[in-house]
Amino acid sequence: YSSAASDVYKRQVWGIGCDATNSEAVEKVFRLKQRPDHKAMIVLVSSADEAARYVRDFPEIAYDLIEFSEKPLTIVYDHGVLLAPQLLGPDGSVGIRVTNEAFSNALCRRLRRPLVSTSANLSGQPAAAVFSDISEEILDGVDYVVDYRRDDMRRSTPSTVMKLSSDGEFKVLRP
């Protein structure tokens, strides 16, 4: 991805993504979505081992939580590293999901980088569950729109979100 690249792709809902290690690309996504700086975006990776590269003191229990989760799972870790600073919370935390969705997983593997993952909508507007829900403003503002699953009318449920501390203690934030 170039410094300002972002694209639109289907995951649980239609999303905007970019290289999560590239501050300029991440900033472009914030501007496009008109999203306040304090509202974090999550990071997608292709495997638990890849997630561990972007977390200081990756808890061992995370491997089991990821492997045995029955639905998409976003884990908020205490200390993100090697990512664009805009993706870290004020306390240094970061939300990371190992994506099982075929396209986004393949994209992470192919690029060998984590991806920002945020819904393809303006901040405060409903998420785009189907391609036709995406506003022209979003479509015109990205560098590329993936030609994949545009006719997919299935509506998916959001991921489970949990906070997982370095010591292995966890709390479910969204079931």
Residue ranges of each PLM-predicted region?
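Internal catalytic-core helix/loop-beta-alpha segment
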Residues: 72-115
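Short helix-loop capping/hinge motifs at secondary-structure junctions, enriched
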Residues: 49-53, 81-86, 168-171
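A phosphate-binding glycine/aspartate-rich beta-alpha loop in the early core of alpha/beta enzymes
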Residues: 13-74
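Residue-level signal for inorganic ion chemistry
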Residues: 10, 29, 75, 108, ...
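Flexible, glycine/proline-enriched loop segments at strand-loop-helix junctions
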Residues: 16, 90-97, 118-128
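Single conserved hydrophobic/aromatic residue that forms the stacking wall/gate
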Residues: 1-5, 9
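Oxyanion/phosphate-interacting regions
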Residues: 127-175
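Solvent-exposed alpha-helices and their adjacent loops that cap or buttress functional pockets
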Residues: 34-36, 66-69, 86-89, 107-109, ...
